[in-house]
Amino acid sequence: MTTALKVKTSSLPGSRLALEVGVPADRCKASYEAAVERLSRSVRLPGFRKGRVPKPVLLQQIGPLRVKASALEDLVDSVLRDAVEQEKVEVLGQPSLSGNFEELLEKFDPAKELVVTLEMDVAPTPTLKSTKGLSAEAESVAYDPARVDELLDQSRRQLATLVPVSDRAAAMGDVAVVSFSGVFSDDKSAIEGGSANGLDVELEEGRMISGFVEGVVGMKPGDKKDVDCQFPDDYPEETCRGRKALFSISLDELKGRELPELDDAFAQQASDKKTLSELREDLENRLKQDAEQRQKNNRHEALLKALVDQLEVELPESLIKEEINSLLQETAAQMAQQGMDVKKLFTPETVQNLAQASRGEATERLQRSLALKALAKAEGISVADKDLEAKIKEVSAGFSDTNKIDPQRLRDAVAEDLLRETLLSWLEENAKLTMVDPASEDKPAKASKAKSSKAKAEKEPAAEGQAKAKPAAKTSKSKTKAAEKLITPID
């Protein structure tokens, strides 16, 4: 049985802990002798069989410093493991020596006790200054009936038939078939890939770099025109960022949109509904649900912010880095789902920039999670087993093949969601939540304590009524890949 180590613990800033460990001389000696034995088995010397090199010869050939270094490496690893286990420390990340290895090696004498100081990140202990009586303001979200007509119009545009136009000038909403070439205004150098023949351009605000669409509007088929444009500062192609350009544009063809009639036939084409009235009703329900969900999200955001304001915690760096990595993995997964080549896009420089940009979001996510954890502990809030089992059963019913689901991971995820729901519902009942009209924030609505049946803050759902909408007919002609890259629509 290993003799208990003499350990002194001291807290460090940033949720770190220092362990000063006194290593007995006999353990130092044992580690040194084990290193000699290990090296004698692995070192090959002329005149000696492998594993039979005498200790004096070994020390003479490879040097006592190498033996001591090998012994100290193993000693530090074993001491760290035993000290953490003995003191029951929840370590995050990789512990490190206080000071450098070379300094410790100079002090290491196998015949004497050695003091090793180790530093490590530890799980933070979040506390809340207050849990009840919190005040928060959230923007109300109202259902807007006008959005029904807007969505119907969007769907009609998507299903529109493109017809040639020759008797008028190009207008916003048309599709222009253009040929163009561009040069930079400052040095008149050609823009790499900044040319195309027969490129379809939707004449909509923000679809192209500034000035391009505006320049085409007013042209008639057969017209040629020089148009001043401006590349945005955040343009993907670095050589173009912020620069002015001159494009010589010819309007080869103009197409107008012939919208379908707003009737039952349109409803059947645009969705799975049989009549226009059914489609309108479906859109109304979707938009109402969307407004309710967004208002609920606003309430939860406001309550979480108020709760985080009460949080007292120091975040260890290793935990922040872990959360950043999680965010980067989510980003990579989303890009992969969109068909992007993640390996090609995620260069070391890109990953570094994304990591730096994600630090704020990672910190905020950790603070929210720890604030909810502290609330659960302070108020003794938990999820009942029967509720957990019922929810797991409900979620499992939505899977086509439950054999592919890890039961423990599913249980953990459902338990986390249910606890979050319970905690946010508790906050709504115990906080003063004022709903504010976003159109006139100086006239706050009456304070409310509306209860919530589901607490996980979900992403705002898109209120798209044009289910199964069909794309407009494509009639694009030849175009260069470079032009697609440089003159890409800017969303």
Curated annotation (Swiss-Prot):
InterPro entries xrefs: PPIase_dom_sf, PPIase_FKBP_dom, Trig_fac, Trigger_fac_C, Trigger_fac_C_sf, Trigger_fac_ribosome-bd_bac, Trigger_fac_ribosome-bd_sf, Trigger_fact/SurA_dom_sf
Gene name per UniProt: tig
Keyword Cell division carried by entry: yes
Compartment(s) of residence: Cytoplasm
Gene3D superfamilies xrefs: 3.10.50.40, Trigger factor ribosome-binding domain, Trigger factor, C-terminal domain
Role, per record: Involved in protein export. Acts as a chaperone by maintaining the newly synthesized protein in an open conformation. Functions as a peptidyl-prolyl cis-trans isomerase.
Pfam families per UniProt: FKBP_C (PF00254), Trigger_C (PF05698), Trigger_N (PF05697)
Biased composition (Low complexity): 463-475
GO biological process: 'de novo' cotranslational protein folding; cell division; chaperone-mediated protein folding; protein transport; protein unfolding
Organism of derivation: Synechococcus sp. (strain RCC307)
Domain notes per entry: Consists of 3 domains; the N-terminus binds the ribosome, the middle domain has PPIase activity, while the C-terminus has intrinsic chaperone activity on its own.
Stretches for region Disordered: 435-491
Protein name as catalogued: Trigger factor
Domain PPIase FKBP-type span(s) in chain numbering: 173-260
A GO molecular-function descriptor: ribosome binding
GO cellular component terms, semicolon-separated: cytoplasm
Family: Belongs to the FKBP-type PPIase family. Tig subfamily.
Catalytic activity from the UniProt record: [protein]-peptidylproline (omega=180) = [protein]-peptidylproline (omega=0)
Enzyme Commission code: 5.2.1.8
Keywords noted in UniProt: Cell cycle, Cell division, Chaperone, Cytoplasm, Isomerase, Rotamase
Top enzyme category: isomerase
